[in-house]
């Protein structure tokens, strides 16, 4: 559960309505893989991830980034039940994929940076603070099965 004021919730949903999930998803996942290269080990089947250009241009990275942001969109629709919304994904990432839960926090922070880059002045400090709450809540929900 994420505790947002009505103003924060409105700001998050208003901005999210303008997000191009295809573009932002691929960019966020790509930047994660470039900035934190150890995360690439979970994506060995994606082919060439040898350079930043290869990562950012990789169609499998873009497609998976879109999928990730699709799940994030579902979370935004269920902010009062993030653990329930992400229970299946938490179980998958914990039991089958063995993803370090710290990676969820890292991806959330990268997503905030990508949103700031895309929206510039519209991504005000209050909007950023609200998004930081949301990505922290999503990361905690995804890490839930690890506890």
From Swiss-Prot:
Site ((Microbial infection) Cleavage): 8-9, 26-27, 30-31, 36-39, 46-47, 53-54, 57-58, 72-73, 75-76, 85-86, 93-94, 105-106, 111-112, 120-121, 123-124, 129-130, 141-142, 145-146
Consequence when changing residue 3 to R: In Deer Lodge; O(2) affinity up
Result of altering residue 112 to A: In Stanmore; O(2) affinity down; unstable
Effect of residue 29 to P: In Genova/Hyogo; unstable
Outcome reported for the amino acid change (mutating residue 68 to M): In Alesha; unstable
Effect of residue 140 to D: In Geelong; unstable
Residues that bear Phosphoserine: 10, 45
Residue(s) carrying N-pyruvate 2-iminyl-valine: 2
Stated consequence of mutating residue 23 to K: In E-Saskatoon
Record annotation: effect of changing residue 12 to D: In Windsor; O(2) affinity up; unstable
Effect of residue 118 to P: In Saitama; unstable
Consequence recorded when altering residue 97 to V: In Regina; O(2) affinity up
Outcome recorded upon mutating residue 25 to V: In Savannah; unstable
Molecular function per GO: heme binding; hemoglobin alpha binding; hemoglobin binding; metal ion binding; oxygen binding; oxygen carrier activity
Binding-site positions, (2R)-2,3-bisphosphoglycerate: 2-3, 83, 144
Listed result of changing residue 127 to G: In B-THAL; Dhonburi/Neapolis; unstable
Effect caused by changing residue 118 to R: In P-Galveston
Family: Belongs to the globin family.
Disease entry from the Swiss-Prot or TrEMBL record: Heinz body anemias: Form of non-spherocytic hemolytic anemia of Dacie type 1. After splenectomy, which has little benefit, basophilic inclusions called Heinz bodies are demonstrable in the erythrocytes. Before splenectomy, diffuse or punctate basophilia may be evident. Most of these cases are probably instances of hemoglobinopathy. The hemoglobin demonstrates heat lability. Heinz bodies are observed also with the Ivemark syndrome (asplenia with cardiovascular anomalies) and with glutathione peroxidase deficiency. Beta-thalassemia: A form of thalassemia. Thalassemias are common monogenic diseases occurring mostly in Mediterranean and Southeast Asian populations. The hallmark of beta-thalassemia is an imbalance in globin-chain production in the adult HbA molecule. Absence of beta chain causes beta(0)-thalassemia, while reduced amounts of detectable beta globin causes beta(+)-thalassemia. In the severe forms of beta-thalassemia, the excess alpha globin chains accumulate in the developing erythroid precursors in the marrow.
Assembly mode: Heterotetramer of two alpha chains and two beta chains in adult hemoglobin A (HbA). Heterotetramer of two zeta chains and two beta chains in hemoglobin Portland-2, detected in fetuses and neonates with homozygous alpha-thalassemia.
Name of protein: Hemoglobin subunit beta
Originating species: Homo sapiens
